[in-house]
Amino acid sequence: VVVDIPKDVSFEKTAYKGYPQSVEMRSYNPVRKGHGGQIRKALQLLLAARRPYIYTGGGVLLADACAELRTLVDLLNCPVTHTLMGLGAFPASDRRFLGMLGMHGTWEANNAMQHCDVLLAVGARFDDRVIGNPKHFAQNERKIIHIDIDPSSISKRVKVDVPIVGDVKDVLSEMIGMIREASARPDQAALADWWKTVEGWRARDCMKYDRANTDVIKPQKVIETLWEMTRGADAYITSDVGQHQMWA
């Protein structure tokens, strides 16, 4: 059981009136299977997209939908990014992974978010570390598809065009089946142009640093050294919360 209390509520003062005699709570029965019509609408947008982009959050991991995500990316051949909580859902070694996005993310991941024409959000909540000021988010015209098991998370911060309420694993499985049965396929020429643009952003190499400067310890150097020391080992690495967590 998780009790989530907003910050403004926790700061308020009130008078204690004792415990209630009884507490009645309605059961939680989430919708697991996505609406077929909404999934078809989403596929129409994705297959017709010239600059598709997949944005995933911790919901993919919680739903054990990593395999389905990888299959979908294979079918669409589009770039994918994660939030902090979604890291690990898609292999970081895959060229289609652009790294984490948001205020602590990569140049290519954030630019792709701002320039895509169809965005598929999967198990993510568009938090402020990702979108910043909602007024300045989605400046370019684009369609947003949002898959989430919690209906209250959809269109909460960013208005979406195709909401799909359901379990991420079930919805992605249904989506994959529909793509395989469909006659339409992504526009490969448009995708090639999109990837050319993405690779231009990636070429900036936003995480690079001056290796010749040994006067200060760079976070990148620390992470690289830690990687070399633990590569191939069955190692567990933990991190405190803060800027160093973002580097880790």
PLM feature segments, named:
Residues 38-53, 72, 113-115, 225-235:
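Glycine-rich phosphate/diphosphate-binding loops that line cofactor/substrate pockets in enzymes
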Residues 5-11, 58-60, 151, 241-243:
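Glycine-rich beta-alpha junction loops
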Residues 2-6, 55, 121-123, 148, ...:
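Short beta-strand segments
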Residues 1-45, 206:
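Conformationally flexible catalytic loops at phosphate/diphosphate-handling active centers
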